[in-house]
Amino acid sequence: MAVIKKPDLSDPVLKMKLAKGMGHNYYGEPAWPNDLLYIFPVCIFGTFAIVIGLSVMEPAAMGEPANPFATPLEILPEWYFYPVFQLLRVIPNKLLGVLLMAAVPAGLLTVPFIENINKFQNPFRRPIATTVFLLGTVVAVYLGIGSTFPIDQSLTLGLF
């Protein structure tokens, strides 16, 4: 496999481009050292300059100062803990809630053993794994959305 494409110098359009200094990246100029030593550092420094300039012109707001004596009415975890928080909030027995949280990875570990005879990578040809994935995604999104509602509306998402 050739690294450099040899130019067809019988083409008059190419001759005109090469005479004007155009077409050299496509016809014969190697990437090392021309592009890697000159163009890439310019792009990298330009990106750093833009990021630093934007951070200086518009710094992130620090928010209001912390007050340990004024706590919010309802404390919510980070967004990626919303489904787990909703499970612990809705299930009346806390031990059952913790067991359900442990059942999620245990159930995911069983999927390869259930579907071990199917060697396809196409998700449409692996119905059990696809169903587990889609059902888990829908349940996680439902629980995550429900955790942002008050406790009396969290199961119905305020719709009923």
From Swiss-Prot:
What residues form the membrane-spanning segments? 36-56, 95-115, 131-151
Name the domain of life.
Answer: Eukaryota
A GO CC annotation given for this chain: mitochondrion
Ordered alphabetically, the record's keywords are: Chloroplast, Electron transport, Membrane, Photosynthesis, Plastid, Thylakoid, Transmembrane, Transmembrane helix, Transport
Stated membrane topology is:
Multi-pass membrane protein
Tell me the Gene Ontology biological-process terms attached to this UniProt entry: mitochondrial electron transport, ubiquinol to cytochrome c; photosynthetic electron transport chain
Q: Name one Pfam family in it.
A: Cytochrom_B_C
> InterPro entries in the record, alphabetically?
Cyt_b/b6_C, Cyt_b/b6_C_sf, Cyt_b6/f_cplx_suIV, Cytochrome_b_C_euk/bac
Q: Where in the cell is it found?
A: Plastid, Chloroplast thylakoid membrane
Principal localisation: plastid
**GO terms, molecular function:** electron transporter, transferring electrons within cytochrome b6/f complex of photosystem II activity; electron transporter, transferring electrons within the cyclic electron transport pathway of photosynthesis activity; ubiquinol-cytochrome-c reductase activity
Q: What PROSITE patterns does the entry give? A: CYTB_CTER
The answer to whether the entry has keyword Transmembrane is yes
Role, per record: Component of the cytochrome b6-f complex, which mediates electron transfer between photosystem II (PSII) and photosystem I (PSI), cyclic electron flow around PSI, and state transitions.
Subunit structure as annotated in this protein's UniProt entry? The 4 large subunits of the cytochrome b6-f complex are cytochrome b6, subunit IV (17 kDa polypeptide, petD), cytochrome f and the Rieske protein, while the 4 small subunits are petG, petL, petM and petN. The complex functions as a dimer.
Family of this protein: Belongs to the cytochrome b family. PetD subfamily.
Q: What is this protein called?
A: Cytochrome b6-f complex subunit 4
- Lineage, highest ranks first: Eukaryota, Viridiplantae, Chlorophyta, core chlorophytes, Chlorophyceae
